[in-house]
Swiss-Prot record:
The gene is psbF. This b-type cytochrome is tightly associated with the reaction center of photosystem II (PSII). PSII is a light-driven water:plastoquinone oxidoreductase that uses light energy to abstract electrons from H(2)O, generating O(2) and a proton gradient subsequently used for ATP formation. It consists of a core antenna complex that captures photons, and an electron transfer chain that converts photonic excitation into a charge separation. GO terms for biological process: photosynthetic electron transport chain. One of its GO terms (molecular function) is heme binding. Its cofactor is heme b. This is Cytochrome b559 subunit beta. HAMAP family: PSII_PsbF. Its main location: membrane. It comes from Picosynechococcus sp. (strain ATCC 27264 / PCC 7002 / PR-6) (Agmenellum quadruplicatum). It holds the Pfam family Cytochrom_B559. It is found in: Cellular thylakoid membrane.
Length: 43
């Protein structure tokens, strides 16, 4: 992860990226778990 000292913390792209990734990943994992549970219950 070599971003370079030319970009200070005034541009928090890592925070936005972290928020977006978690906002998309957490519900995805929850949905996958719910679907898997439903499939196992139906079977």
């Amino acid at each position: 992860m070599t971003s370079g000292p030319n970009q200070p913390v005034s541009y928090p792209i890592f925070t936005v990226r972290w928020l977006a990734v978690h906002t998309l990943a957490v519900p995805s994992v929850f949905f996958l778990g719910a679907i898997a549970a439903m499939q196992f219950i139906q079977r």
